[in-house]
Amino acid sequence: MLGNHQIIRADGRKVDELRPVRITRHFTDAPEGSVLIECGNTRVMCTATFTPGVPRWRKDSGLGWVTAEYSMLPRATAERTDRESVRGKIGGRTHEISRLIGRCLRGVIDMKALGENQIQLDCDVLQADGGTRTASVTGAYVALVDAVNWAEKHRHIKSASRVLKDYVSAVSVGVINGTPMLDLPYIEDSQAMTDMNVAMTGSGTFIEIQGTAEHRPFNRAELGTLLDLAEKGNKELQAAQRAALSLD
């Protein structure tokens, strides 16, 4: 069951195959970093804003700060949802995903090399078909790199290569009808017995593993298979990041 790679999914992929990934840099003009990431039918705009100075609680520490915000457009999904700003309250899911993105990016930044400067990432989901948080991490990293390179060019930091310690990306995995699969679209995610999001660095270490059993508990063998799938997917996503960043 765990090694079955002959199953063909509804979208024609193998169980260990990513959806088509496209990363477009310089998607908008104003931000220091701006990326559109497309993972299948999921599309997220990720922007990075570099600001000299840090929040009050970080002042005089000699350290920088990286933070993130996540949101979805009202019609990113099949049915319209009100903007959270209109409702007057940021939802728990939004807070959770924003913190996830921030943690993943901070995990590959040398805050001392960044100095007392702040980089804010904004991840706005234009179209959602599963994996929006993982696409946000993967796209936001590329926007972050562009912002750090901008800061070096404008002499806000000494060395971009010192600030950027490693790559980071994230991907979803899950167990569907007893079979572990990589990179779940919404139709699979909604049926998953186990759903997991895994963020990894370019050196193969983990920053985040979020895993939940929905319909039945998962066993140790399935966990190992899911992590193997996530490692494969993240290596391929980081190859896509490198390819996008090599275009200048």
Swiss-Prot record:
It catalyses: tRNA(n+1) + phosphate = tRNA(n) + a ribonucleoside 5'-diphosphate. Gene3D superfamilies: GHMP Kinase, N-terminal domain. Keywords: Nucleotidyltransferase, RNA-binding, rRNA processing, Transferase, tRNA processing, tRNA-binding. Phosphate binds at R93, G131, T132, R133. One of its GO terms (biological process) is tRNA processing. Pfam families: RNase_PH, RNase_PH_C. One of its GO terms (molecular function) is tRNA binding. Its EC number is 2.7.7.56. Belongs to the RNase PH family. NCBIfam families: RNasePH (TIGR01966). Phosphorolytic 3'-5' exoribonuclease that plays an important role in tRNA 3'-end maturation. Removes nucleotide residues following the 3'-CCA terminus of tRNAs; can also add nucleotides to the ends of RNA molecules by using nucleoside diphosphates as substrates, but this may not be physiologically important. Probably plays a role in initiation of 16S rRNA degradation (leading to ribosome degradation) during starvation. Homohexameric ring arranged as a trimer of dimers. This is Ribonuclease PH. It comes from Bifidobacterium longum (strain NCC 2705).
